[in-house]
């Protein structure tokens, strides 16, 4: 906090902008998901699960800088250093949860005092439930977000987005006279390769100033 205050004071003396940015909000993948949710194209969102475990780190990584993985100097582990962007996206996409239950491992995989493994369950007033899993101790790991809604399932893995779209699971449950049938689905793939190749997240943030 002391160093942060120094940076703020310096920026003010030069009348310059000084900010901490969460650039993933401008990632075209999540911008599209935000549009689908806000436009009610997914219907009611029932559940999401984000498994972000491709942050694999070694003991040597934590030993290279004295500030790493210490409560006093970093303030936490995988949640504050690596997965802070995904936590921010959870809040941006789905809102603030009403309650959070978390089971975390302090130095489960590494010789550190802070968390390197986390499993959290988010509960929301509207009935939505979310699961968030992250660690720096699994290899090869995965980055996968599932969003289950009344209009089907969206899967985002390594920036590949697939929507298995249906009319309405709620209406099908109410009105179907079959035992095991499921609603017909349409598979939609979204392609963001060109935008992602240009690394436009930081560009958009800078343009926003």
Where are these regions (language model features)?
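C-terminal glycine/acidic-rich active-site capping loop/insertion
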Residues: 146, 150-209
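Short catalytic-loop micro-motif centered on adjacent basic/acidic residues
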Residues: 18-21, 131-133
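Predominantly a Rossmann-like dinucleotide-binding segment in NAD(P)-dependent oxidoreductases
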Residues: 16-17, 24-111
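Rossmann-fold NAD(P)-binding glycine/threonine-rich loop
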Residues: 1-16
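Active-site beta-strand termini and strand-to-loop segments that position acidic
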Residues: 115, 120-127, 147-149
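Glycine-rich phosphate/pyrophosphate-binding beta-alpha loops
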Residues: 84, 109, 133-141
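A general structural signal for well-ordered alpha-helical segments in protein cores
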Residues: 4, 30, 86-87, 202-207
């Amino acid at each position: 906090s002391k160093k942060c205050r120094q940076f703020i004071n310096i920026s003010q003396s030069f009348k310059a902008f000084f900010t901490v940015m969460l650039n993933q909000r401008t990632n075209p993948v999540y911008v599209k998901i935000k549009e689908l949710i806000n436009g009610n194209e997914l219907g009611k969102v029932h559940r999401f699960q984000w498994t972000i475990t491709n942050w694999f780190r070694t003991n040597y990584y934590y030993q290279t800088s004295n500030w790493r993985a210490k409560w006093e100097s970093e303030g936490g582990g995988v949640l504050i250093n690596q997965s802070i962007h995904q936590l921010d996206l959870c809040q941006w996409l789905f809102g603030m949860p009403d309650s959070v239950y978390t089971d975390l491992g302090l130095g489960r995989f590494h010789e550190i005092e802070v968390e390197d493994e986390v499993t959290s369950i988010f509960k929301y007033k509207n009935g939505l439930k979310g699961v968030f899993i992250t660690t720096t101790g699994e290899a090869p790991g995965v980055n996968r977000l599932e969003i289950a809604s009344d209009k089907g399932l969206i899967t985002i893995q390594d920036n590949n987005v697939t929507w298995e779209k249906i009319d309405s699971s709620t209406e099908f449950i109410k009105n179907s006279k079959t035992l095991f049938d499921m609603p017909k689905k349409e598979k939609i793939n979204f392609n963001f390769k060109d935008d992602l190749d240009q690394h436009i997240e930081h560009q958009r943030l800078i343009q926003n100033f």
